[in-house]
């Protein structure tokens, strides 16, 4: 594309220069003067001839200059004075690092554009009364073969090469890699090596009443194993593992030989581990607070522990860092007083404050270039340019329409209605290409508002974003050719559009993508966004004192609304005017910060004054839903997001796991790669292996599926992998290797059976051959199960493996348990899927776990069974096979064939067969009642559809559970244009029969079912906002069933927001009656499901 030459750069007017020369320099209180010359001693890489000591150069460096200029000054001095001047002629400054020492650590002065007076070393030297400070000039080292091999291993684990900078228009990726070294090293240095090696899974939440009742006299029996011997001991639920070991060794003092314990060994040499699992009970936590113990109590299982030697912490050794540290001042600019041009001679100006730039922001749209034109060439195109902050569009302009061709040139300046000084950090220049059949727009560049009618029926084709203020706080300038993202026609990809359109990454497919050429104003000097200095807000007390009663009530009503309730312009004005009153109510924070006009620098400054006075927020109890709201796509300001992350610091590990899925998604809404949230995830992953395990898979899955955020997730994952330790790296390598091999087998098997549902004997034979070949060659001896890191799978049990009768041909795989201390011969069953996106199933299963935790606070155990499920790549994943469970369809068919769907007594008879002892049968019925109630409430609130007898299962102990969550939030399936879902949830006559109820007759079990349903439903209503927020944060992940706020409205309606408790109770009881009245319609659907020949196999979540 031929582009015209750019006009002369913007220059400062002579009268302004003269005026500034007359003004005296000013300095910020307590900071270096912007005009100050700073003495620094530089230790050079060359040595003196006689003494052989390093040469030094004492320079007086301008505080307002940048690091690059300081480096050039050093080079000039070295060229003039060094005895090895030829060395400095031969090598340039870019081949050297600037290092300084702080508290025994070497730090690199990394950012070449950083203003000298903002360097951390200056503040450190001042604190230490050291003048002049010393900076070492050190030659960059060439990476060793070992380093390159390690980076190659990391690239394989990440699934993306973070060293490839071919698709970046700045150095943010490398900049972030370096910035994350410091928090990583701090976390690794501070973690307890022994606890990290054993990663106990604990909680500090009180034991629910229903579990307390299962502990008689606060005592628990545990079985301790050693070799082939075991010993049962009685302990207190409040005992710590250390106390239990001490008691056990006292009891076994004369019987050590029976347990294969030498006389010299004591309790100090052992730890307690769960039999068959990599799950340790260590630390000062009471026994009742270990999650595994609670799980055993809940399921009525015995607690079996093995007396084991602790793992060697050396196995978690972290590879030594080859990079010097960079401090947190890297990339930070000075205050406005330091950067301002006012009071400086123009020869002394090196960096200019953004707040001095009073002109309006503009961009020159040069043109677009597309490799292949669309089929319909009778089109016109135009460019729409928005400046936006989060979801808030600050201003908009667009070009005139022109005929669509391979090359379209405009060469037109678009001037925005926002001044450069008002551009907030995180502001995006959003460029979008629209096309329409007829030129419905004015031929001149216009300034329409978003959504204006003049856009007519224009269709969005391409988009790309550019951060206007980069990761160094510097205003972008000059030429850019940006490769754009195409709007996908695939429904599953359209769901992620709202998140994707926030990315600042460009399309890596440069050869086949649309490119747009733009020009931003050039300047004589870098333009830097200054740091905000906290100052008092004179309006604060006056505004607070003036609030009338009526407006106070109005404000409280706005604050009380749920997150889906849109704020009117009047609401926003009221919230902002009475911002200091709003500050008293933590629930107001998301609404208050949504009311900020981020395109006005004065307003932003006042917002930071508010944030400085957030004592009530800091002291308030953690409300996860509220805090997560501040991390959604509506907030781009790093300070607002930082107070949310700060609040999350108090989350215990188990809760971090609960919300990890959303927290990883929230990283997409950060404007920059390095953020408080990214550091929080990194820190918690490095602190706890269980969190680290899931963080690895959640990030890796996103890297594989989200091209728009590959770089961001990759740089966080690399930072984690560099600090997780050798043992974790080996585990991940094994897991990735297994998945890659199984993926290849699945693809081969699918190619043999095409898209058919049935599975031929030839296909089964081929599978067994391929698995045997795998077992004999490349399959690791053991690997950690991705959805359950406590389990290690061993060799395949090939005779039990099969191809499932489903369109995508998932593999039913069974492995031996690799842990020799496992007590049973049960295999580890895994369904390996290729071709389905499991992220929606993961979300529903995660929400079910959160519902469980909500119900636990009400002392309700609804026996949910959120089985293991994890996405491990692009439409690849694993699902846990629940043991001793079968589908309702199989039970019905095995008895009387397809008509079993109409036989009310079939399920009850099957349960009696499995539990022939009356006591066990009654316990199974009780479990059935509670689990049925739990899934009725959960599936109703989440709008889970397409419920049939092949995706509802039951265990041999009466635990009902649902699988396959392809239709959620009321997006129900239809058959021949008719909605199949005629009931709010599944409560069929055969379910009622198990409860002793039929027709309209009641029973004690049915009454209990109703009571439990109502309690569970009302408990969820108290957490409506949390559920709404969790789904809102997943809106932009690409799930076809979760694409708009209208989808989430379903939850609000299902939970009857706005109704009284009594009305809500009546509403849910009415839903139960609807199910009883129309249960026959469900049975008829189930009958059709069987008759139409939909294959069952041993289908589970397939």
From Swiss-Prot:
Residues 34-141 form the PI3K-ABD domain. The lineage of its organism: Eukaryota, Metazoa, Chordata, Craniata, Vertebrata. Keywords: Angiogenesis, ATP-binding, Cell membrane, Chemotaxis, Cytoplasm, Endocytosis, Immunity, Inflammatory response, Kinase, Lipid metabolism, Membrane, Nucleotide-binding, Phosphoprotein, Serine/threonine-protein kinase, Transferase. This is Phosphatidylinositol 4,5-bisphosphate 3-kinase catalytic subunit gamma isoform. It is an enzyme of class 2 (transferase). Activated by both the alpha and the beta-gamma G proteins following stimulation of G protein-coupled receptors (GPCRs). Activation by GPCRs is assisted by the regulatory subunit PIK3R5 leading to the translocation from the cytosol to the plasma membrane and to kinase activation; the respective activation involving PIK3R6 requires HRAS for membrane recruitment. Wortmannin sensitive in nM range. Inhibited by AS252424. It comes from the Eukaryota. GO terms for molecular function: 1-phosphatidylinositol-3-kinase activity; 1-phosphatidylinositol-4,5-bisphosphate 3-kinase activity; 1-phosphatidylinositol-4-phosphate 3-kinase activity; ATP binding; ephrin receptor binding; identical protein binding; protein serine kinase activity; protein serine/threonine kinase activity. ATP binds at residues 829-838, 864-872, 961-969. The gene is Pik3cg. Belongs to the PI3/PI4-kinase family. Residues 943-951 are annotated as: Catalytic loop. Phosphoinositide-3-kinase (PI3K) that phosphorylates PtdIns(4,5)P2 (Phosphatidylinositol 4,5-bisphosphate) to generate phosphatidylinositol 3,4,5-trisphosphate (PIP3). PIP3 plays a key role by recruiting PH domain-containing proteins to the membrane, including AKT1 and PDPK1, activating signaling cascades involved in cell growth, survival, proliferation, motility and morphology. Links G-protein coupled receptor activation to PIP3 production. Involved in immune, inflammatory and allergic responses. Modulates leukocyte chemotaxis to inflammatory sites and in response to chemoattractant agents. Residues 803-809 are annotated as: G-loop. Transmembrane segments: none annotated.
């Amino acid at each position: 594309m031929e582009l015209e030459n750019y006009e002369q750069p913007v220059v400062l007017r002579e009268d302004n220069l003269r005026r500034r020369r007359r003004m005296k320099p000013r300095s910020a209180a307590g900071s270096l003067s912007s005009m100050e010359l700073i003495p620094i001693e530089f230790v050079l890489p060359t040595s003196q001839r006689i003494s052989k000591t390093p040469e030094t150069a004492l320079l007086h460096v301008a505080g307002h200059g940048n690091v690059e200029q300081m480096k050039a000054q050093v080079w000039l001095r070295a060229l003039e004075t060094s005895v090895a001047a030829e060395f400095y002629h031969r090598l340039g400054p870019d081949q050297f690092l600037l290092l300084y020492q702080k508290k025994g650590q070497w730090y690199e002065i990394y950012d070449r554009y950083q203003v000298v007076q903002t360097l951390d070393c200056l503040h450190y030297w001042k604190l230490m009364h050291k003048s002049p400070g010393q900076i070492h000039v050190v030659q960059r080292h060439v990476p060793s073969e070992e380093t390159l091999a390690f980076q190659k291993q990391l690239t394989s684990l990440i699934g993306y090469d973070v060293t490839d900078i071919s698709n970046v228009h700045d150095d943010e990726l490398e900049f972030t890699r370096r910035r994350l070294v410091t928090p990583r090293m701090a976390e690794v240095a501070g973690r307890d090596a022994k606890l990290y090696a054993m990663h106990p899974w604990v909680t500090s939440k009180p034991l629910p009443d229903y579990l307390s009742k299962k502990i008689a006299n606060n005592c628990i029996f545990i079985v301790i194993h050693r070799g082939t011997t075991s010993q049962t001991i009685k302990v207190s639920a409040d005992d710590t593992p250390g106390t239990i070991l001490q008691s056990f060794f006292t009891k076994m003092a004369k019987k050590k030989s029976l347990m294969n314990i030498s006389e010299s060994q004591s309790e100090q040499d052992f730890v307690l581990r769960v039999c068959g699992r990599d799950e340790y009970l260590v630390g000062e936590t009471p026994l009742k607070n270990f999650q595994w113990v609670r799980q055993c109590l809940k399921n009525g299982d015995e607690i079996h522990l093995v007396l084991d030697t602790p793992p060697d912490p050396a196995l978690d050794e972290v590879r030594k860092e080859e990079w010097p540290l960079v401090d947190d001042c890297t990339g930070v600019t000075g205050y406005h007083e330091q950067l301002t041009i006012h009071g400086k001679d123009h020869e002394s100006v090196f960096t200019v404050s953004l707040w001095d730039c009073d002109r309006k922001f503009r961009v020159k749209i040069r043109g677009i270039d597309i490799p292949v034109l669309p089929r319909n060439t009778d089109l016109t195109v135009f460019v729409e340019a928005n400046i936006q902050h989060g979801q808030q569009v600050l201003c908009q302009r667009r070009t005139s329409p022109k005929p669509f061709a391979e090359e379209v040139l405009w060469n037109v300046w678009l001037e925005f209605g926002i001044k450069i000084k008002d551009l907030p950090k995180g502001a995006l220049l959003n460029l979008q290409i629209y096309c329409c059949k007829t030129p419905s727009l004015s031929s001149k560049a216009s300034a329409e508002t978003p959504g204006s009618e003049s856009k007519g029926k224009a269709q969005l084709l391409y988009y790309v974003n550019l951060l206007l203020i980069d990761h160094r706080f510097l205003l972008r300038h000059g030429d850019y050719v940006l490769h754009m993202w195409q709007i996908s026609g695939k429904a599953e990809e359209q769901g992620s559009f709202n998140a994707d359109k926030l990315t600042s990454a460009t399309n890596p497919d440069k050869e086949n993508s649309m490119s747009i050429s733009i020009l931003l104003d050039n300047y004589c000097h870098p333009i830097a966004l200054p740091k905000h200095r906290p100052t008092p807000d004179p309006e604060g007390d006056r505004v607070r004192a003036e609030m009338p009663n009526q407006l106070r009530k109005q404000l409280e009503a706005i604050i009380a609304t749920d997150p889906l309730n849109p704020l009117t312009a009047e609401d926003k004005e009221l919230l902002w005017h009475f911002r200091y009153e709003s500050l008293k109510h933590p629930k107001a924070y998301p609404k208050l910060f949504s009311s900020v006009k981020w395109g006005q620098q004065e307003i932003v400054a006042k917002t930071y004054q508010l944030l400085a006075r957030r004592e009530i927020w800091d002291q308030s109890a953690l409300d996860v839903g509220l805090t997560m709201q501040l991390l959604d796509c509506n907030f781009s300001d790093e300070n607002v997001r930082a107070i949310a992350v700060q609040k999350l610091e108090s989350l215990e590990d188990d809760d971090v796991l609960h919300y990890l899925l959303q927290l990883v998604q929230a990283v997409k809404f950060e404007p920059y790669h390095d953020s408080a949230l990214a550091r929080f995830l990194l820190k918690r992953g490095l602190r706890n292996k269980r969190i680290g395990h899931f963080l690895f898979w959640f990030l890796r899955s996103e890297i594989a599926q989200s091209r728009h955020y590959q770089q961001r997730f990759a740089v966080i994952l690399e930072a984690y992998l560099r600090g997780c330790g050798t043992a974790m790296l080996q585990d991940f390598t094994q897991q990735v290797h297994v998945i890659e091999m199984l993926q290849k087998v699945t693809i081969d098997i699918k190619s043999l059976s095409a898209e058919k549902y049935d599975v031929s004997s030839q296909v089964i034979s081929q599978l067994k051959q391929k698995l045997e070949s795998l077992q004999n060659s490349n399959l690791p001896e053991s690997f950690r199960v991705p959805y359950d890191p406590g389990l290690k799978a061993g060799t395949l049990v090939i005779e039990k493996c099969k191809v499932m009768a489903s369109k995508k041909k998932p593999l039913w795989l069974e492995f031996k348990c690799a842990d020799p201390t496992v007590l049973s011969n049960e295999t580890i069953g895994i369904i390996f899927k290729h071709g389905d996106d499991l992220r929606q199933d993961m979300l529903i299963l995660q929400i079910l776990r959160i519902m469980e935790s909500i119900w636990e606070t009400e002392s309700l155990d609804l026996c949910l069974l959120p089985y293991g499920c994890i996405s491990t790549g692009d439409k690849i994943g694993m699902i846990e096979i629940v043991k001793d469970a079968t589908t309702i369809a199989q039970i019905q068919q095995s008895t009387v064939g397809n008509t079993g769907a109409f036989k009310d007594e079939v399920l009850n008879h099957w349960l009696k067969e499995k539990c022939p002892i009356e006591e066990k049968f009654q316990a199974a019925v009780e479990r059935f009642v509670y689990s049925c109630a739990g899934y009725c409430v959960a599936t109703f609130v989440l709008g889970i559809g397409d419920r049939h007898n092949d995706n509802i299962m039951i265990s041999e102990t009466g635990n009902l559970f649902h699988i396959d969550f392809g239709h959620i939030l009321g997006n129900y399936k239809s058959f021949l244009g008719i909605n199949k879902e005629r009931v709010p949830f599944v409560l069929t006559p055969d379910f009622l029969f198990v409860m002793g109820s039929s027709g309209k007759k009641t029973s004690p079990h049915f009454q209990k079912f109703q009571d439990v349903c109502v309690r569970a439903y009302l408990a969820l209503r108290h957490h409506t906002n949390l559920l709404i927020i969790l789904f809102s944060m997943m809106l932009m992940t690409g799930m076809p069933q979760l694409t708009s706020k209208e989808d989430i409205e379903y939850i609000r309606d299902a939970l009857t927001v706005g109704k009284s408790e009594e009305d809500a109770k009546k509403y849910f009881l009415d839903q139960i009656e609807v199910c009883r009245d129309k249960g026959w319609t469900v049975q008829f659907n189930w009958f059709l499901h069987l008759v139409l020949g939909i294959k069952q196999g041993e289908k589970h979540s397939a």
